[in-house]
Structures are given as C-alpha cells and as structure tokens.
C-alpha cells in the first residue's frame, strides 16, 4: 500500500510543478537590496529588514484551469493564498495589488467579485494593479505587502524538531476544484482573524523554529520544500495525519487546505503550540520528526520507505544559503 501511495504522490503535478521554480533558483540564492542587506530567496515571502522588523513581499499566480472553471473562486483564492503567505512568516498583511487579463468584461467581473469578497473577509484592501478585458486569454496574478515584528522562515528547521500540521476541518471540497478544501468562504471574519493571528503570536513568542503554509503541493510537497530550504530530512508518519470526514485520504494529502501550515517546533514547545490551535477548534498534529540529511521518508503502519532524496533530486533548488 505504501509503495503505491508513494508512486502516486511522486507523480502528482502539484509536486512536480514545484520543480519549475528551479528556473529562478539557478539565478542565485540571495539578492542584495540598496543598503547591501542580503535577502535569502525561496521563502513564502521576501523578508526585507526595516526599522520596525520586516516588510514582507509576495506574489502568486492563479492556475488557468481554475480561472476557467471557477472564476469567482480563482479571484477569492488569489487574495487568500497571498494572505496565507504573509501569516505563514509571522506577519500581518497590509494591502494587495493585482494584474488581471481577461477575454471579456463579464469574465473579469466574476474574478473581481471573488477578489473583492476575499479582500473584505480578510480585511486586506486591494489598492492598485492592472486590468485588461481585451486579452486573448484569462490570467490573474496578485502581489501582497505585509509586515512582521519577528519571522517564521522556512530556513531554520532544526534536527529533533517535531513537524506540526495545522488545518481546519470546518470546510468542504470546492465543487469545481476537488483538491481545494474550502474552509474560508462560509467563515466569519472574526473567526478567520483569530485563526490567522495565531501565526504572528508564535513568531513573536519564539515558539516555532520554521514553518510554511500548505500550498498546492499538498502536505507532502510542502514538507519537501520546507526540508529543502532548511537542508534537513524527516521521517513523516502518515498514520498521524487526520483527514476530514468523508474525504479520501489521498485527496486530502494533495489538497490545498485554505488554512494549513507545517510548523517545525522544538519538543518542549509542541504541547503549547498544539494547544494554541486546538483552543480555536483547529487541528494540530505532530506528524514528523526532523532528521539530519536530505531524505524525506514516509511511514505507514509497519512500513517505511524513502519518498524523496533532495540531494539527488532537488525540488525548487532553493537551499536557504546566504
């Protein structure tokens, strides 16, 4: 059973498409800004030091298939995924801008409606961008600015840390996008804000060594990216991962969960970190242990097999080098 699951996961596009990022990583692992400060590349956001902590800058593009099948939800997700990037690094969002190309005003309006709904729900204004409704195709990209007092990076997982998976089971698969678990469109702003605020709380109280939001690479793909940038390995116990009722386990492993994070936490802080999320009705489970090396090993029942060797087969190519 584990062998079949590994073969399926290794071939999923959500993971394989992350290798496209190697086009960027081959250009270097850091960039210098005006004052000579080095910005490490490969995190959820670029973290730019300023006098009050860090400015956070990120951008996301929407899959063309999602824009075609569910334009409102594509607009919604374009804001959601950017907001998630900011909170994943311990920050708070300030504003977003967008770049929208569409074949018609009607299509653009549906996308805009989703973006505006998410903007209102997450209290993050859309403050500018680019719009073209005479394009030969539909495309959407959104960028976000945020600020953090303290960071949760994906560069600093430590050997011996426990990897905690955080998720929200109060949702359902989106009808036109079954690998998108929708835990946000029906939730109240106040509830969502309480959930988001837990991440900067962890950062500011130094309760987390590293972290990353769960992306379209799913739980396993996100774990790989975190291990790669931290230059670590891990043993991940699939039996430790709970699944929402009525959802196939393999589907859950590959889903974008709306609200989902992998947090690398020192053993003495695991109980505290889990309690923070569980107090808000969220799921927080220790699913892996950070190991020396460069291998992600999956465990299921009494079976244990190598899933990925990041030294032999890089994923994004970003290794957190400064």
Swiss-Prot record:
List the Gene Ontology MF annotations in alphabetical order. thiamine-phosphate kinase activity
Q: Which InterPro entries does this UniProt record tie to the protein? A: AIR_synthase-rel_sll0787 (IPR024030), PurM-like_C_dom (IPR010918), PurM-like_C_sf (IPR036676), PurM-like_N (IPR016188), PurM-like_N_sf (IPR036921), ThiL-like (IPR006283), UCP036540_AIR (IPR011413)
Tell me where the signal peptide lies.
Answer: none
Q: Could you give a single Gene Ontology term from the biological process aspect?
A: thiamine biosynthetic process
Return the similarity comment.
Answer: To M.jannaschii MJ0640 and MJ0799.
Q: What NCBIfam families would the database entry show?
A: AIR_rel_sll0787 (TIGR04049)
For this entry, the protein name equals Uncharacterized protein sll0787
Originating species: Synechocystis sp. (strain ATCC 27184 / PCC 6803 / Kazusa)
């Amino acid at each position: 059973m584990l062998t079949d699951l590994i073969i399926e996961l290794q071939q999923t596009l959500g993971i394989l498409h992350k290798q496209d990022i190697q086009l960027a990583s081959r250009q270097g692992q850091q960039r210098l800004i005006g004052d000579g400060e080095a910005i490490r590349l490969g995190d959820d956001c670029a973290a730019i030091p300023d006098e009050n902590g860090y400015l956070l800058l990120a951008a996301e593009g929407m899959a063309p298939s999602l824009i075609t099948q569910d334009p409102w939800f594509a607009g919604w997700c374009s804001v959601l995924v950017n907001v998630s990037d900011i909170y994943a690094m311990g920050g708070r969002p300030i504003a977003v801008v967008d770049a929208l190309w569409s074949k018609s005003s009607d299509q653009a309006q549906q996308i805009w409606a989703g973006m505006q709904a998410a903007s209102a729900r997450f209290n993050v204004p859309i403050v500018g961008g680019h719009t073209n409704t005479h394009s030969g195709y539909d495309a959407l990209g959104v960028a976000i600015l945020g600020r953090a007092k303290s960071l949760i990076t994906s560069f600093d997982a430590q050997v011996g840390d426990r990897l905690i998976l955080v998720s929200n089971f109060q949702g359902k698969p989106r009808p036109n996008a079954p690998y998108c678990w929708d835990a946000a469109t029906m939730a109240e702003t106040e509830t969502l804000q309480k959930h988001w605020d837990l991440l900067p709380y962890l950062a500011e109280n130094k309760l987390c060594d590293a972290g990353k939001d769960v992306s379209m690479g799913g739980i396993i793909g996100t774990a790989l990216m975190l291990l790669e940038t931290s230059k670590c390995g891990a043993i991940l116990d699939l039996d430790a991962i709970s699944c929402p009722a009525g959802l196939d386990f393999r589907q859950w492993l590959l889903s974008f969960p709306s609200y989902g994070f992998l947090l690398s936490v020192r053993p003495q802080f695991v109980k505290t970190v889990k309690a923070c999320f569980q107090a808000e009705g969220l799921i927080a489970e220790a699913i892996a242990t950070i190991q020396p090396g460069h291998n992600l090993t999956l465990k299921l029942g009494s079976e244990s097999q190598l899933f990925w060797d990041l030294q032999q087969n890089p994923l994004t190519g970003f290794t957190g080098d400064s």
